[in-house]
Amino acid sequence: MTAVPEFTVIIPTHNHARLLPYAIHSVLTQTVGSFELIVIGDGVGDDTRDAVADLSRNNKQITFVDRPKSPRTGEPYRHEELLRRETPYVTYVSDDDLLFPDHLEHTREMLATHDLVHGFGLHVDAAGSLVLELVDLGQEWFRRRELKKTSHASLTAMGHTMPAYRRLPYGWRTTPPGKFTDHYMFQQFLSDPACHVSTLRRPTALKFPFILRQTWTDDEREQEMALWARRLSDVKERAMLLNEIMTLLHRQAILLEIWRGKRVWWLWNLLAALRRWMQR
C-alpha cells in the first residue's frame, strides 16, 4: 500500500514551457521529501507537454493533468484533483515563480496550527531588485481589507489544510470576469470566521510578476529565472539573499517609524490649534 504524502503541491500552467521546469525543480529540491507534485495543464501546447515529460519520466512524484483551456486559469481542474486526494496539506506555486528549498518545511510548521497560510510577500521587479509586500493576514485589519476589494493574495506559497478546503462551500471554481482568481479563492476562506489564517514569517518563495514583464521575450524571462534559480539553490547565495531581505525590512521599519512620527507631530499640531481656537 502506497503511503499518503504530507503535501500535494499544485502548479497550474498554460504557456510558460520554458519557465515551468525551473518552478518544478524548485519543488523537487525541497527539504521535505514527502510530497506529490500535480502539474495541471490549462490548454497547453506540445512544448509544455514535452517539458513536463522530460522531468516526470524518471520521477513518480510528478503527475501531469492535461486539460483543455478553461474560461480563466483552470480553477475547476484544481478542485477535481484535490477531491481525489487525502494529503493533509496543500500548497501552490505559479509556473513562473520559484520556491525556496525550505518552503514545505515552514509551511508545514505553520499549518500545524492554522487552516490557511499566505506567503511572505517578496517579488523581483523588472530592474532585478527585491521588493517586499508587507501583509499579515493574521491581523484583523488586513483580513477585512482582503475581504473587500484590496488584493494582496498570491497563489505562489499559498498553503492550506485539506480539512479546511473540504469545509469550503465551493472550493476552486471559475472566477467571474474582473476578479483576480487568487483573491477570489482567498475571500472564500476568509469569509469563514472560524478559519484560522496567518502569513509566513519568513520568505519561502520568489515571485516574478508578469505584469512587470509583458514586453519581455522568452529568452529574457528564462535568463532571469535561471539566474535566480541558481541563487536559491546555492547555500551561500541564499544566505546573502536573506541578508538583503533583512536590510529591506530594516529600511521599511525605519520608514514606518518616520511616518508614525510625522503623523503624531501633525496630530499634536492639530490639537494645539484646536485648543487655541477654543480659548478665543
Segments predicted by a language model, with ranges:
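Nucleotide-sugar donor-binding/catalytic module of glycosyltransferases
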Residues: 1-249
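Boundary detector for helix-to-coil junctions that initiate low-complexity/charged tails
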Residues: 230, 234-280
